[in-house]
Amino acid sequence: MAADLETAKRECVVTRAAEELLTGYERPIVLMKRRIGGKAATSVAPDNPYIGVILPYAPLQLLLFSYNDGLHMPDLLVMTSANRSGMPICRTDEEVRTDLPGLCDLILSHDRDILLRVDDSVVTLFEEEPYMIRRSRGYAPLPIYVNGDFHGTVLSAGGELKNTVCLAKDNLFYLSPHIGDVGCVRTETAQHECAVRLRDLLEITPQCGAADIHPAYESSQLVKQA
């Protein structure tokens, strides 16, 4: 996370299209070519010519860089989601204490509960056009319009890896935020909660479902339950 656009330009080659993504209201992580001589540690994405950069999008993140408390805060911070690999993002203090011991020194809590998990979106550029790698915060569940003669409602459960569910009504396809790999009970629960939330939010009852043909996949079970 860079404190501002100038910091991002110091670390990466920021094209006009990349700048529009970085400063847009969606505020995704943008993969860009790193500059030689930047201040980012070589241990950040080692042996990779690209790094993902995001600008602050929440008040707390702005305060990390600008709060006048006498402490000098670097203008570039390593940022990651509050979860272990293969697990959903922690949503409660108890989940943080259970899942992240040894990974963080301090926990900032609040009396306002987190109701919905959502990852940062990840975008790169191909010929100066946005290319979505992970469609989540800022983009989901905004619909994608698909040309064709489509009628009815469908729930698509996605695969076991890098999972996302989709609820379609006629030509509008509503993708959920990124869920992740479905391989444990908690991730399966998160997938189910996400599908129910999408259904209730859009007031769409699926008439049929689409899933991987493997009967043991949790995504297949989700469609059967729906």
Language model regions located:
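Active-site-adjacent structural elements in enzyme catalytic cores
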Residues: M1-A226
